[in-house]
Amino acid sequence: MSDAVTIRTRKVISNPLLARRQFVIDVLHPNRANVSKDELREKLAEIYKAEKDAVSVFGFRTQFGGGKSTGFGLIYQSVADAKRFEPAYRLVRYGLAEKVEKASRQQRKQKKNRDKKIFGTQRRAQKRAARRNAD
């Protein structure tokens, strides 16, 4: 961790519609395997005087031979803007949202096929019962 890490940003674009600045990040990390995204978020927040939670980094590729990685970064004007525009999976990654657990694919298919077997008056009665139970 004592090895120096250099962060350069290029192609910086201000995107007022999405309330963010977006740019390409070049990270020089000689004698080091890679730099964690969390560490990059901290350093970018420090450089651009923003909150760490308003910074998003992704899409990093390390060049052959190591020592240099290139990726993409976004800095939102506020954490609220980040929560509004960032994809849910990235918010989960950064700890800003909870992961939505859903039934497995097989369970969803089995339910769909079970529901297909009930039709006609039985189906109508089932919907009514479900509505009553919901109230």
From Swiss-Prot:
Note the Gene3D superfamilies from the entry: 3.30.70.3370
| InterPro entries, per database record | eRP_eS24_sf, Ribosomal_eS24, Ribosomal_eS24_CS, Ribosomal_uL23/eL15/eS24_sf
Q: Which domain of life is it from?
A: Eukaryota
Q: Which GO BP terms apply?
A: translation
Subcellular location(s) per record: Cytoplasm
**Keyword Metal-binding appears in the UniProt entry:** no
- Give the Gene Ontology MF terms in alphabetical order: structural constituent of ribosome
**Pfam families xref list:** Ribosomal_S24e
| Keywords assigned by UniProt, alphabetized | Cytoplasm, Ribonucleoprotein, Ribosomal protein
Specify where the region named Disordered lies, as residue ranges.
Answer: 102-135
Start-end of Basic residues biased regions: 105-115, 124-135
**Annotated Gene Ontology cellular component terms:** cytoplasm; ribonucleoprotein complex; ribosome
Classify the main location: cytoplasm
Record function comment: Component of the ribosome, a large ribonucleoprotein complex responsible for the synthesis of proteins in the cell. The small ribosomal subunit (SSU) binds messenger RNAs (mRNAs) and translates the encoded message by selecting cognate aminoacyl-transfer RNA (tRNA) molecules. The large subunit (LSU) contains the ribosomal catalytic site termed the peptidyl transferase center (PTC), which catalyzes the formation of peptide bonds, thereby polymerizing the amino acids delivered by tRNAs into a polypeptide chain.
Q: Oligomeric state and partners?
A: Component of the small ribosomal subunit. Mature ribosomes consist of a small (40S) and a large (60S) subunit. The 40S subunit contains about 32 different proteins and 1 molecule of RNA (18S). The 60S subunit contains 45 different proteins and 3 molecules of RNA (25S, 5.8S and 5S).
The entry assigns this protein to a family as follows: Belongs to the eukaryotic ribosomal protein eS24 family.
Under which name does UniProt file this protein? Small ribosomal subunit protein eS24
Q: Which organism is it from?
A: Candida albicans (strain SC5314 / ATCC MYA-2876) (Yeast)
High-level lineage: Eukaryota, Fungi, Dikarya, Ascomycota, Saccharomycotina
